[in-house]
């Protein structure tokens, strides 16, 4: 059971109650938390498009705490981040693993951050296949194609050679916030709001 806090704001016209996520959206803050699936992706994409249509000159702040999830859903968010005109600042809090690490590194260059005790984890995509031999071969080819696509994005975002990304994503590879900065996945560590290390 997920309880969503309510925030009450006073104005000259009286009180107004918002769920916390709607209130954060007024400040151009989007929360990407939990496993990435189609429903979460649709919610994030809708918020990105709404904020960009509202004012494409202002930054959007995407806070990420996610174990990753469905690659196609994550790539839909990735494509939208690149499609809109607004700069997207990414801020990792807690963990950005798997597909979430790709999104964290895909924020606007110079505006990709992590909180001091957060972690980033990169690895190869996982999947399973069953059925006839040809179906298993098709699934294996698809996962190899997906791995190449994700590693290419990580290489572009980090500035690391694709060969290094291929090696470093063979297994789960956990990076502290500082390690993620040195690797090139993020640009800085946020000690305080708008105060970068």
Curated annotation (Swiss-Prot):
One of its GO terms (molecular function) is serine-type endopeptidase activity. GO terms for biological process: protein quality control for misfolded or incompletely synthesized proteins. Pfam families: CLP_protease. The active site is at residues 98, 123. Keywords: Cytoplasm, Hydrolase, Protease, Serine protease. It catalyses: Hydrolysis of proteins to small peptides in the presence of ATP and magnesium. alpha-casein is the usual test substrate. In the absence of ATP, only oligopeptides shorter than five residues are hydrolyzed (such as succinyl-Leu-Tyr-|-NHMec, and Leu-Tyr-Leu-|-Tyr-Trp, in which cleavage of the -Tyr-|-Leu- and -Tyr-|-Trp bonds also occurs). Its EC number is 3.4.21.92. The keyword NAD does not apply. It is found in: Cytoplasm. Its main location: cytoplasm. GO terms for cellular component: cytoplasm; endopeptidase Clp complex. InterPro entries: ClpP, ClpP/crotonase-like_dom_sf, ClpP/TepA, ClpP_His_AS, ClpP_Ser_AS. CDD domains: S14_ClpP_2 (cd07017). Belongs to the peptidase S14 family. Cleaves peptides in various proteins in a process that requires ATP hydrolysis. Has a chymotrypsin-like activity. Plays a major role in the degradation of misfolded proteins. Fourteen ClpP subunits assemble into 2 heptameric rings which stack back to back to give a disk-like structure with a central cavity, resembling the structure of eukaryotic proteasomes. This is ATP-dependent Clp protease proteolytic subunit.
